[in-house]
A protein has these predicted regions:
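Bacterial Sec-dependent N-terminal signal peptides
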Residues: 1-37
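Short internal beta-strands
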Residues: 90-98, 179
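Glycine-rich, charge-decorated loop segments at or immediately adjacent to ligand/cofactor-binding or catalytic sites
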Residues: 103-107, 177-199
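Glycine-rich oxoanion-binding loops at beta->alpha junctions
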Residues: 111-141, 153
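Glycine/threonine-rich flexible loop motifs
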Residues: 150-162
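Conserved anion/nucleotide-ligand pocket segment
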Residues: 200-272
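Glycine-rich, aromatic-lined ligand/substrate-binding cores of catalytic
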Residues: 243-328
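Conserved functional hotspot residues or short segments at active or partner-binding sites
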Residues: 297-410
Length: 412
């Protein structure tokens, strides 16, 4: 493998640099070009099917809608607008997950609505002091409709909101209707451990793997069939047409809408399941930069040394490139980024082949390499790391001095 020597990249002159684009990065660009040039598969979401074929699921009903800006139909019209245009549907309430209705709240920021400037029913955030709808909020509601684009990762909190909404519905004998949408990082790939319920939290609410390989509708069904919710609500799922589990999101004809401020594109969603583990340390996961989760670093890291150490693992589908960056406060995206206004050195992650790339393996080897190279600088945030990983084994093996390959062989 021609990994340790940077290839020459000719623009107007030959440039020699530790960050010179090499042949693996050129392959990534080539692969991305092929991905975007493929013919798109026509997909109708659960919302499209509801509106065009099955409106009877909500006709004559008083509904509460759980959604955000990703809940649009094929024409790009928000679901709440479509429901408000239906004479025989009473939209009583809109509930929003983390980041709010318009996806403008930063990660972890509590959201409250007083006046949002447009004519809507009552809008209530389920990412403030209240994360589960109360009986008063659901008074007069007989169906809760859930329509949010997820990204197929356990600690992405929208699925925790789904579970809590279904719990409230079951307790109050309210039916739930889930409008299915694609798993953007495919529905046939599973990565990472199943959550140990001793470590249950809002970033891990059900015993599923980190990359769980289900659509949101399939996951809702799983919650019912596995008796994870009791009493269980009556659940209906309106499935998609045209989608299948081997499709990446950009292989569909659907429009990508950023599901949250720090997931700006599909490649970030692909990298996220493993690189979000960096949140469990004092190392920047790239918030406050244009490329969260693709860029990681700290002022005391040597990006060249770290990239070379990781490239030696010869992981499929990924190349590690030295990167320097300065995290900055970005309103609505990164309010308090790690190492704000400090120059960081670290990595840029290039996915050269997303079909073979394993995000969780990448995150694990990155963590073990960082811990081995900077034992006096890196800080592990034990509680948060355990919640993300789903048990305490990763933390224990890191502090014990195990190697990344050993961990992958025995525990992943």
């Amino acid at each position: 493998m021609f990994r340790s020597i940077a290839a020459l990249f000719i623009l107007s002159s030959i440039v020699f640099s530790k960050e010179t684009i090499n042949k693996h990065q050129l392959q990534a660009v080539t692969n991305k070009s092929k991905e975007t040039s493929k013919a798109k598969t026509e997909v109708l979401t659960g919302l499209d099917i509801l509106l065009e074929q099955k409106p009877y699921f909500i006709q004559g009903r008083s509904i509460a809608l759980v959604t955000n800006k990703t809940g649009i139909d094929k024409a790009g019209i928000p679901n709440y607008q479509r429901f408000m245009e239906m004479d025989d549907v009473d939209l009583k309430m809109i509930f929003t997950p983390e980041h709010g209705l318009f996806g403008k709240a930063a990660d972890g920021e509590k959201v409250a609505y007083d006046s949002i400037g447009i004519k809507l029913p009552t809008v209530v955030s389920l990412y403030g002091n209240i994360r589960k709808p109360t009986p008063d909020m659901l008074a007069g509601v007989n169906t809760i409709v859930y329509d949010i684009q997820d990204i197929g990762t356990r600690f992405y909190t929208y699925i925790s909101t789904l579970g809590l909404v279904m719990e409230a519905a079951g307790e109050l004998n309210i039916s739930v209707l889930v409008l299915d949408r694609p798993n953007p990082i495919r529905g046939d790939i599973i990565e990472g451990p199943i959550l140990n319920m001793e470590f249950r939290s809002f970033v891990g609410y059900y015993p599923i793997p980190i990359r769980y390989g289900k659509t949101i509708g399939e996951l809702a069904d799983l919650m019912i069939t596995n008796n994870w919710i009791s009493p269980a609500p009556v659940l209906d799922v309106i499935s998609m047409e045209g989608w299948h589990e081997k499709l990446w999101f950009d292989e569909t004809d659907l429009v990508w809408v950023n599901p949250s401020p720090n997931i700006p594109d599909l490649e970030t969603a692909i990298i996220y399941p493993g690189m979000c583990l960096i949140e469990g340390t004092n190392i920047s996961e790239g918030r406050g930069t244009p490329h969260p989760f693709k860029w990681i670093g700290a002022p005391w890291i040597d990006g060249w040394d770290l990239s070379q150490a990781l490239n030696k693992f010869d992981l499929p589908g990924v190349e590690f490139v030295p990167k320097s960056f300065i995290p900055d406060k970005i309103p609505g995206k990164a309010e308090n980024p790690k190492f704000e206004n400090q120059k960081c050195s670290g990595l840029e992650i290039w996915v050269t082949d997303r079909d073979s790339f394993k995000s969780v393996d990448t995150g694990i080897l990155t963590l073990f390499s960082l811990y081995a190279m900077y034992p006096d600088k890196i800080e592990l945030r034990e509680k948060h790391l355990n919640m993300l990983w789903g048990n305490n084994i990763l933390f224990k093996e890191l502090v014990k001095g195990s190697t990344g390959p050993y961990f992958l062989q025995h525990y992943n």
